[in-house]
Amino acid sequence: MKKQIQEFIAQNRQNIIDDWRDLVNMEGSCRQPDAMHTIADWLCEKFQQAGVDCQVYRVRDEVPPVVAGVIGADRPGTPVIFTGHFDTVFDPNTFGPNPFRIEDGKAYGPGVLDMKGGIIITLYVIKALEAAGYKARPIRICFCGDEEAGKFHAYACEQFQKWADGCIAGFNMETGPVNNDLCTGRKWAMWGHLDVHGVSAHSGNNYTAGRNALVEAAYKILAIQNCNDMEKGTNMNPAVIKGGTVPNIL
């Protein structure tokens, strides 16, 4: 079977690159749910063509969807699952139209590795196994469109839990380290929200009566930043700040 799989991959190299290019060129972040729905439909069709009983799970138009399914549901073995996401951190046209390109043997473009490349690998893993006559166990897939925002919509988390339930192993198709080492675990993130309140006063004739919330927030931001410890792998990132009313009011 190994030889059959290797031959299939070699014979389909250009098809793999073409699908990779098309997916990367369908740009969009989770901030553009319309783009996520378009990509989800494209992915669902591709996996259906590969034999996967696949569908797009939608909750609302403004919420990025989930693509999930299974091939070989009646096979005797315990299922495995491939997971991932099809959103990126980049807004459309950040790198101009059709940003996918290959230079000196390397591919470039938004999401080319994180993680549209991993989704294309999943697609062709399934195709290669099918071509080789694999019948050992069911293979499930589950991909969301809002991972880069932390899967803020509980719907995606529910779908991942549903499809992963009962699986013997899961393969998250995110890119590994740049040195090609195998990545067996990932550091997750936690989002926090901090409100800082001041005392409103006129900044000209009543300055001492006020307390500037922005100044206090600046101290808090520096304190958070000082919690960084690269040796321990601790990353603190004050990312978004909103505050103030008008220039002459504390």
Protein language model regions, located:
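Acidic/histidine-rich catalytic neighborhood of metal-dependent amide-processing enzymes
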Residues: M115-K187
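Acidic-enriched catalytic cores of C-N bond-cleaving enzymes acting on peptides and small amides
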Residues: T184, G204-L250
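Acidic/His- and Gly-rich active-site-bordering loop/insert found
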Residues: K2-P110, E130-K135
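Short glycine/proline-enriched loop/turn "hinge" motifs that connect secondary-structure elements
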Residues: F90-P92, Y134, C183-W188, P247-L250
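Glycine/serine-rich anion-binding loops at beta->alpha junctions
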Residues: K106-I120, H202
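Phosphate-handling active-site elements
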Residues: R75, E103, V125-R140, I224-G233
